[in-house]
Amino acid sequence: MKAFIVLVALALAAPALGRTMDRCSLAREMSNLGVPRDQLARWACIAEHESSYRTGVVGPENYNGSNDYGIFQINDYYWCAPPSGRFSYNECGLSCNALLTDDITHSVRCAQKVLSQQGWSAWSTWHYCSGWLPSIDDCF
């Protein structure tokens, strides 16, 4: 009986943990949100290396006490308000929890803002994406 209760609790908690996307589902959703097609492979590469395409990831604490959130691992010191209430510049004007949901709209909009202000090198994993990029041609 205890095992059954644990399984039910895990099943109910699973949706709150986000979802795992793949290169094509990410590319299609970002395209539907208006992201230019010539950027989609770069975003797929970043998502692969930052979160393994998982929307519900909160990264380990950084050297300054901040954390990174969501599929693009957006930093809470600069871009979103952390749940702890700790100071944040909150440039995207949203709660970091909004970056952890199945709906990637907030993550995409905030990531686009990061890109426009800091460029691709804002992501520490960008060096993995500066040469070879995953193909998205078969996604459409």
From Swiss-Prot:
Record-linked Pfam families: Lys (PF00062)
GO molecular function list: lysozyme activity
Active site, UniProt feature: 50, 68
Reactions performed catalytically: Hydrolysis of (1->4)-beta-linkages between N-acetylmuramic acid and N-acetyl-D-glucosamine residues in a peptidoglycan and between N-acetyl-D-glucosamine residues in chitodextrins
Biological process according to GO: defense response to Gram-negative bacterium; killing of cells of another organism
Disulfide cysteine pairs (residue numbers): 24-139, 45-129, 80-96, 92-110
Cellular component GO terms held in the UniProt record: extracellular space
Keywords, sorted A to Z: Antimicrobial, Bacteriolytic enzyme, Disulfide bond, Glycosidase, Hydrolase, Signal
Signal peptide location: 1-18
Domain of life: Eukaryota
Tissue: Found in the midgut.
Keyword Methyltransferase tagged: no
Domain C-type lysozyme residues, every copy: 19-140
Enzyme Commission number(s): 3.2.1.17
Family: Belongs to the glycosyl hydrolase 22 family.
Role: Unlikely to play an active role in the humoral immune defense. May have a function in the digestion of bacteria in the food.
Protein name per the record: Lysozyme B
Taxonomy of the source species: Eukaryota, Metazoa, Ecdysozoa, Arthropoda, Hexapoda
Gene from which the chain derives: LysB
